Amino acid sequence: SPEFLEWLRKVCDVPHLLPDPYLVGAGYMKSYRGDSLKIHSDFNWNEECQTHRALSLILYFTPEWEEKWNGDLQFWDFDKQGKVVSYLPEMGNVVIWKYHKRGFHGHPNPIECPDDKFRVGFRLFYYIADSKHDWRDPPHKSLYWYDKDADQPYHLENEYGHGNLDANED
């Protein structure tokens, strides 16, 4: 709504903030036992709108969640020394963060919830209307840390457990 968008602009101090009418990469998300999301930096460019990412928002509506099940959204320092802060995917939790090329996050530990439980949320992305090209952070898709042990970029299994999504896909 216009009121929510204005609230986001004020709270996050991001003028000229726009929602994405195409919902690129946005929407419902559901994770099951064994799922994980490697630490990554989000895509920064919306080709449809020709705008740069400014904010990410996740609203969790997991009915019941225990910390021991993992699945917490973790924000890591750029040097991959460890997490700085994390948020449980509990009902009603909202996490909003400004896009930054070094804004690495994910839920890297496999979820260990009972088979009848799952982690659910809804994600939205917001963009800057007055985007200017930044040669230090050119448009890109999501970037995943390199896995030195496997000698390849980290891979993600898609939500149905088939195939891989690599660092060049989002």
Question: Which ranges hold each PLM region?
Answer:
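Acidic carboxylate-rich catalytic motifs and surrounding loops in phosphoryl-/glycosyl-chemistry enzymes
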Residues: P21-G27, G106-I111
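Catalytic core of Fe(II)/2-oxoglutarate
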Residues: G34-D35, D42-R53, T62-D170
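Amphipathic alpha-helical recognition patches that constitute DNA-binding helices
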Residues: G27, S56, G121
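Beta-rich nucleic-acid/ligand-interaction surfaces
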Residues: V24-K38
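Signature of the catalytic double-stranded beta-helix
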Residues: S1-G25
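Short, conserved, surface-exposed binding loops centered on an aromatic residue
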Residues: H16-D20, M29-K30, N46-T51
